[in-house]
Each structure stands twice: as C-alpha cells, then as structure tokens.
Amino acid sequence: MITPQNVFRHEFIGLNVEVINSKHEKFIGIKGIIIDETRNTIRVDTGKNEKLIPKSDVVFLFTLPQGEKVSIDGKVITARPEDRIKKKFTKIR
C-alpha cells in the first residue's frame, strides 16, 4: 500500500499528479495521470494531450490511491525509477 511515508519507493505511473510550483510558469497547474517516467522527466496525460515535465524544476502534488495528497519536490525524485525504488530515503516530515 502506498502511504505518504513510502511514496518514494513506489511506482508513480498511474498516480494523479498536479504541478503546484515551478521555475517556469507554463508548468504550474498541469494535472493528470502519470503515464511514463524517466530519470529526469514525468509524462502526464491531461485528458486533452500529453505533457512532458522536467522533475528538477517543479514541485508535484501526488494524489495517492487512498485519496491522500503528498507534495514532493521534483529534485528529490530525480533518478531512474528502478534506482529510486531501491534507494533509502531519510524520514520526511
């Protein structure tokens, strides 16, 4: 089960996400379902089209399957998905 404490160690594909802060204004407000993830980017299906978002420039708001919302700075998750899942993270408040 995905919780706010272990979300970093899970697959992001299929989760709902929204960009809540960014260095570039054009990314703020993008929301949809994650359909692909690479080391540096997340691809989001917005319902109208697909958007490719650089992880390092944004803060994401993930909606977990139970409805909980978790805000994550993209710099923290900039890694290949298979490496991020294995990585140990310090406790996040």
From Swiss-Prot:
Source species, domain of life: Archaea
Protein known as: Ribonuclease P protein component 1
Location in or out of the cell: Cytoplasm
Name of the gene: rnp1
GO cellular component annotations of the record: cytoplasm; ribonuclease MRP complex; ribonuclease P complex
Alphabetized InterPro entries for the sequence: RNase_P/MRP_Rpp29-subunit, RNase_P/MRP_Rpp29_sf, RNP1, Rof/RNase_P-like, Rpp29/RNP1
Assembly and oligomerization: Consists of a catalytic RNA component and at least 4-5 protein subunits.
UniProt keywords, alphabetically: Cytoplasm, Endonuclease, Hydrolase, Nuclease, tRNA processing
Keyword Cell division: no
